[in-house]
Amino acid sequence: MADTKKIKTALISVFHKDGLEELLKKLNDEGVKFLSTGGTQTFIESLGYACEKVENVTTYPSILGGRVKTLHPKVFGGILGRRDNEGDRQQMAQYEIPEIDLVIVDLYPFEQTVASGASEEDIIEKIDIGGISLIRAGAKNFNDVVIVPSKAEYAVLLDILNKQGAETTKAQRRQFATRAFGVSSHYDTAIHAWFNK
């Protein structure tokens, strides 16, 4: 089918690592290349899988105490680039932007941090910027990209991988995108409610 896309490269950046092992094993078995940052990269490598640092792609380090890690044109270009758009493809080649076909990300635990009675400073640090941006980018470009916005979606992707290999249909990618915008909306609503207190 023309709308079927193969997952070749996955960007993985998660706060919660539990439940990720089985999915990583299946993706690795399917020959998917891993890109990651910080603690997630260390976790992936601890399982024995090769994983390229996002910093190697961007040639820019994580800065501002980790506030800026994935926010870079080489990352977002790789997610948002339209594979069927000749202009996008030419620019991706010109600027050496890798295609990213799968984004697995979750968000800093904002609501749990608020509920714990944390200080305003700690709560503000749990307002996710990079993660929410990755979710929105992956969801926007569902024509080409699978977005997994929380660990609740791991089993859904694993089921697809077990049945279809690393191939997804446009309908499946759209379903992931729909749930991703739901995650994004819920998260921003919680932040708005806290600021509105």
Locate predicted features:
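N-terminal glycine-/serine-/threonine-rich phosphate-binding loop
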Residues: 1-57
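Structural motif
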Residues: 2, 27, 92-95, 137
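Internal alpha/beta core interface subdomains
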Residues: 5-8, 97-197
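Short, basic, glycine/proline-bearing loop/turn elements
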Residues: 6-10, 73-80, 120
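Conserved residues at beta->alpha junctions
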Residues: 14, 83, 148
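Short glycine/serine/threonine-rich phosphate/pyrophosphate-binding segments
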Residues: 19-20, 87, 132
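Short, flexible coil/turn micro-motifs enriched in small/turn-prone residues
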Residues: 33-34, 60, 125-126
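Glycine-rich nucleotide/cofactor/substrate-binding loop typically near the N-terminus or early
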Residues: 39-109
